[in-house]
Amino acid sequence: RSSDLPVVEIGKVVVEAKNITVNNRFGVKKVDGISFEIREGEVLGVAGVEGSGQTELIEALTGLDKIESGEFILNGKNLTNLKGLNQSVEKIAHIPEDRHKRAAIAEFDISENFALGQHGNRYKKGLGLLNFDKILSEAKKYIEKYDVRPIDPKLIFGKLSGGNQQKIIVARELEKENIFIIAAQPTRGVDIGAIEFIHKMILEEKKKGKAIMVVSSELTEILNLSDRIAVMCAGKISGILNREEATEEKIGILMAGGKISE
């Protein structure tokens, strides 16, 4: 397994989570004092039974939820509860776990979905207007690079297969300027061909020295992509394993809140 990962020199610390606590809207603690680091060129996998706090952690790191206590530092800058955290400005790429709710508009066409969330800088042409020619030409480029079928950028997003929809979201997030990539359930509900392709594109970003967090309920996905694996249980990290020592059995024990004997 480890031979499949590209050999990448792990660089400086990019992401620092320090004792982060997040409550849900009812005041119930969902993330309970979590700490981890992610370095350049490193993939940290986050495993756990769904509902262990992964969703709330991601929402806190992307500015969608409030960090109750603790700190989130990205590239030396403290982003904890930054008012109006702009993911593009802070160079955070976010592949959300629910593409229909958080990542795309089904009634928009492919090119319009490529431009979502990027209107503030990349596609402006003065007077606050969008450069639709640029949006269309970039959409064509990414459709080819990410092997999206059919190849027409004016097709309605909602009419595409799940795999092609997900490739568009992955393309949009990976192609924008970023230093930290959060990939949440990146291959949920897609076919095997799309799974392999999306994994390949995530590992290409690792080669470029990006700090990457992959959150998945699929253990094979976590094992195939990660350098280290943080296992969550009931809002806490129950253990962090290096990929060389990680097995499905060990991860399963930690997911249930157990301890691994040395």
PLM regions with names:
Residues 1-262:
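Glycine-rich phosphate-binding loops of nucleotide-dependent enzymes
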